[in-house]
Amino acid sequence: MVDEELFDKSSNDHSISSEEEDMLVRSYSNLNVSFGYHCNSYQCFSLDTDEYDISPNKRLETNTMMTSQNGSFTCLSGAAISANFTLANTNICKGLIGEEILPELDSPNSFRKIVSSPSMSRLDLLSTSQGSPVSTESSIFEISKNIWRSSAPTTVSSNFLTSTEIKMAGGAAGEDRVQAVCSEKNGWLICGIYDGFNGRDAADFLAVTLYDNIVYYLYLLECRIKQENGLYGSPEGSLNGVKSELTLAMRFAENEDVKFSETFRAGVLKCLTTAVEQAENDFLCMVEQEMDDRPDLVSVGSCVLVVLLHGTDLCILNLGDSRAVLASVPSSGMDKLKAVQLTEIHSLENPLEYQKLLADHPNEPSVVMGNKIKGKLKVTRAFGVGYLKQKKLNDALMGILRVRNLCSPPYVYTNPHTVSHKVTEDDLFVVLGSDGLFDFFSNDEVVQLVYQFMHDNPIGDPAKYLIEQLLLKAAKEAALTAEELMRIPVGSRRKYHDDVTIIVIILGNAQRTMTASTSL
């Protein structure tokens, strides 16, 4: 259900003292992840923090913020800070994820080109490392891989998610992981926030597999659309690998009847859902194979938030309590901003989720204990956390770690919430955040903070700014100075705030953004 909040655009004053500003500048070094991406009329460029300082005392000297009228976004920024102490996970999948794949993918401070092979994906490597197919339920997945390989290298160059010019940024903060992938030529953006718990193994697994899963299933959708709409052999359907047939299909959908457009968008959402289901099957299969050595893996899980943006189409999937919040100005001309929550809250704090859980287990008085599912977990839908889904995985745990009276699993579900939104001229930006952000700010407060900041700092970094404001508020609530809070080591700091991961996407073109920024 879409949640909307209205408030006055000019209601808050966000000035800070010079002491606080000095602390915030120093806090940049404590960010685990901080990246930015700006688009212009011809290309997008990465903001490498080694080259650019976007601190309160220094601004980028550039006039290349103008984007094409067809651009899906003007710029984005991402930032993350840890509070949980988490060891780097190097041993799942025989160490392949931690030792080989993640070092290749992680780029916490800038976007960089993805090095990929048309003949062997990261998922192939994982299958090889385990000596068998990653999942026992991979028939569709195997078909997609066969189609992929039979068409290489043409397929790889034609699919937007594997074109040679895509760039990725991301990294880890405590148990969280964040990724952002952009295809400059095809105008696609995909972002993921994976809020892990009981360890980071599940979030790490998502970071190295979910993107590839999305690639495969969108490619299958691409093939089906080409067949159904006669794009094979047409001039538009053969661009020598410059643009994606899926991009062409999207444009075709925009120019055709509403029924076709809705069917196409439903297909994209289905691809995202199937990609998560595939990752879930693969992860639990891996857990079952390795739980003799790592029984703790059965309790590891992650929330999932994925956003795919192309043109005016915004597709969102979520499991758990991370949020995507859209900021827009009503076309009526009212001097109000509107915060629209595009995601659902899958936790016991949501009455609908609470009642569904009880209804699914009507004869169990101990389903919820201490405001947690079986006394263990607050989120009702999540990736992984196999011991609350399968009895055999729960049996791998010893003593007090094992869930007693696991009568009718699953108790945690994997069916995600999905939604597609047609971006309009009223929509300004989208804020993606793990629940750590919303522990301190409501949806309307988040939108107001970003709006005011972008008005005062049109080429600043709103994701960093949100984390800075969160740290100030956390310190104030704990009766500490901001500097004292920053001195508390990771692990102990979890008493004051959670791991926090944020992505802010400024939608549309610079003309719209500048108009919104000067409307106060």
From Swiss-Prot:
Q: Which cofactor does it need?
A: Mg(2+); Mn(2+)
InterPro entries recorded: PP2C, PPM-type-like_dom_sf, PPM-type_phosphatase-like_dom
Which part of the chain is the PPM-type phosphatase domain?
160-507
List GO molecular-function terms, semicolon-separated: metal ion binding; protein serine/threonine phosphatase activity
CDD domains (alphabetical): PP2Cc
Q: Name one GO biological process term.
A: signal transduction
The record's comment on cofactor binding reads: Binds 2 magnesium or manganese ions per subunit.
The record lists its disulfide bonds as none
Catalytic EC class: hydrolase
Reaction catalyzed: O-phospho-L-seryl-[protein] + H2O = L-seryl-[protein] + phosphate; O-phospho-L-threonyl-[protein] + H2O = L-threonyl-[protein] + phosphate
Q: Which positions bind Mn(2+) 2? A: D195, D435, D498
Q: Which family does it belong to?
A: Belongs to the PP2C family.
Name of the protein described by the UniProt record: Probable protein phosphatase 2C 39
